[in-house]
């Protein structure tokens, strides 16, 4: 009898709990639905107000000429003379540039819910990579006119939920392809031109709209001919791009204009954030493998075959030179902190590790890597090759036939951090860039004491020099230290 009573009580208790659970889930679903509705209402309200301002808030702003990228008179490489050895000495420095702290990417002001309505699929290409987005059924986006009213109406049309799938698909591509902010902006440009036509006002406002809805700071302007132009705000100072001074800072112009300025709608969007030029992770473009290149050190200790993704190089061609704040030497950290792609690591690193197995210590491994970078690559000035200064990402040095001191130092710093797990800093002298490595055991040679750590100079452009040797004529010059991430 007691057992029967226990069973009945248990059943009743289970039924009660089950009913409570159902009620909770029902209430939660209703709450979730209401919250989503509130989000959508908020976003539509914001876009409606934004469009209303677009009908009236356009003012003339004069263009600010581009800041030219720094031109450093780089010193030529020097051949090491064993007979000119000197006592180890500290490197004098007067500034330490801190390591970067990349922030999370911007996000929409409200979740973008998938629209279950009818749609059509559009495909496009960006950096050799296929993209696919959903557009409204029978998509035909046109701006009826070239004035403030027409542009505001176009913004209102885009902000209907018919275009929510497009925004979602673009954000999914950003996530799946691990696109940095600049790559995402370029992708949106390719998408917009594919569906609206190259150089059209429709393509410009579509790119601006999706970038804005993704959480980024944008401004729209138009020329004297009423052609739309997109302006973007950056965390960093960008060289070689003209800009416009808005209420919250400088915005950069991506498309050329013949006029001395633009009529700009300087209206902010809630929670908007500037784009960043940090590349925190590999950009996963479709792979287009380059021709094989052999890279052999002069003493034959290290010999490898190298191939890179040409689609990635195509993206790097678009990447603008920039600096953090107003510190011109910070620009090299942007390149040195960018990781090598997985495919390059899978091909190159096993070969390098196999060669370094013969080394008797970590210090000797670093020395062999140094000699490889010193002698396997051909030195040439950027002015002669590119007609302007151009720093390389590590992959570019592995691909292009020539490189200079900054490219070698960027590559060497990447290899030492990845293969040997050691901390590396960049050392900038006037006209020259080198590296310094923090070994776990004391190493003889020129050094930098920094934050309680001992860094030994390793110069990839001092040809034939072992670790610990500073290139001649650098000794008495004040250096700047650039801290790097892992």
Where are these regions (language model features)?
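Extended, non-transmembrane interaction/recognition domains
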Residues: 192, 198, 202, 206-357
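Sec/Tat signal peptide C-region and signal peptidase I cleavage site
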Residues: 15-19
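Active-site neighborhood of thiol-dependent amide/isopeptide-bond enzymes
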Residues: 194-207, 380-440
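Long, contiguous, compositionally biased segments that the model treats as domain-scale units
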Residues: 29-32, 36-210, 214
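Hydrophobic/aromatic-rich core segments of domains that either
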Residues: 218-247, 357-360, 407-486
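Secondary-structure boundary elements
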Residues: 134-137, 145-187, 333-399, 461
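Sec/Tat-exported extracytoplasmic proteins
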Residues: 35, 39, 43-46, 50, ...
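Sec-dependent N-terminal signal peptides
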Residues: 4-13
């Amino acid at each position: 009898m007691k057992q029967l009573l226990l069973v009945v009580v248990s059943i009743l208790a289970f039924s009660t709990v089950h009913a409570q659970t159902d009620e909770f889930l029902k209430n939660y679903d209703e709450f979730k639905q209401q919250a989503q509705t509130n989000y959508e209402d908020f976003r539509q309200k914001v876009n409606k107000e934004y469009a209303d301002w677009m009908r009236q808030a356009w003012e003339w702003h004069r263009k600010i000429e581009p800041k030219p990228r720094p031109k450093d008179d780089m010193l030529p490489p020097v051949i090491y003379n064993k007979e000119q050895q000197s006592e180890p000495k500290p490197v004098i420095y007067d500034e330490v540039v801190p390591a970067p702290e990349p922030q999370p990417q911007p996000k929409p002001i409200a979740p973008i819910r998938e629209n279950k309505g009818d749609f059509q699929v559009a495909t496009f290409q960006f950096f050799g990579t296929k993209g696919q987005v959903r557009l409204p059924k029978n998509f035909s986006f046109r701006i009826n006119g070239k004035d403030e009213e027409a542009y505001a109406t176009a913004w209102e049309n885009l902000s209907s939920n018919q275009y929510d799938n497009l925004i979602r698909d673009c954000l999914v591509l950003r996530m799946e392809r691990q696109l940095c902010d600049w790559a995402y902006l370029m992708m949106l440009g390719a998408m917009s031109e594919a569906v609206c036509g190259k150089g059209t006002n429709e393509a410009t406002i579509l790119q601006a709209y999706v970038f804005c809805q993704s959480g980024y700071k944008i401004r729209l302007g138009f020329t004297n001919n009423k052609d739309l132009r997109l302006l973007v705000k950056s965390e960093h100072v960008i060289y070689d791009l003209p800009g416009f001074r808005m209420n919250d800072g400088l915005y950069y112009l991506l498309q050329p204009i013949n006029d001395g300025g633009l009529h700009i709608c300087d209206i902010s969007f809630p929670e908007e954030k500037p784009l960043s030029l940090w590349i925190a992770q590999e950009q996963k473009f479709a792979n287009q493998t380059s021709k094989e290149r052999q890279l052999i050190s002069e003493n034959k200790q290290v010999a490898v075959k190298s191939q890179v993704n040409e689609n990635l190089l195509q993206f790097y061609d678009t990447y603008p030179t920039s600096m953090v704040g107003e510190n011109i030497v910070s620009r090299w950290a942007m390149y040195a902190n960018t990781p090598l792609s997985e495919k390059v690591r899978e091909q190159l690193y096993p070969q390098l590790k196999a060669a370094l197995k013969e080394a008797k210590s970590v210090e000797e491994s670093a020395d062999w890597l140094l000699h490889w970078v010193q002698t396997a690559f051909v030195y040439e000035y950027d002015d002669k090759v590119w007609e302007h200064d151009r720093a390389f990402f590590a992959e570019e040095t592995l691909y292009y036939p020539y490189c200079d001191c900054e490219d070698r130092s960027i590559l060497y710093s990447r290899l030492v951090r990845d293969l040997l797990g050691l901390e590396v800093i960049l050392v900038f002298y006037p006209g020259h860039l080198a590296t310094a490595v923090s070994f776990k055991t004391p190493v003889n040679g020129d050094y930098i004491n920094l934050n309680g750590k001992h860094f030994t100079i390793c110069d990839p452009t001092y040809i034939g020099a072992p670790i610990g040797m500073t290139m001649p004529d650098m000794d008495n010059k004040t250096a700047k230290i650039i801290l790097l991430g892992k």
